[in-house]
Amino acid sequence: MQTFFVEIKCALGKTYEVASALAEAEIASEIHSIAGHYDILAKFYAPQGVVIGHFVGEKVQTIPGIVDTRTIIAFKAF
């Protein structure tokens, strides 16, 4: 499994709608509201062979209310 995180910037007033849509899609293992340049931090696990860029583009960025994302790929958990 590949672990990665996506920081998500939402349209104004849409953070909770986006978080709910992510939860309903059952694609993220964790979803957190955060402070800073982005509104949500979501943790994902992808099976080997899944292209993370395609996954984010097709499954995450298509959720209404998302205006920007930043993907962080994790190497090892300690």
List the model feature ranges, each with a label.
Residues 1-78:
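A compositional/biophysical signature of low hydrophobicity enriched in polar/charged and small residues
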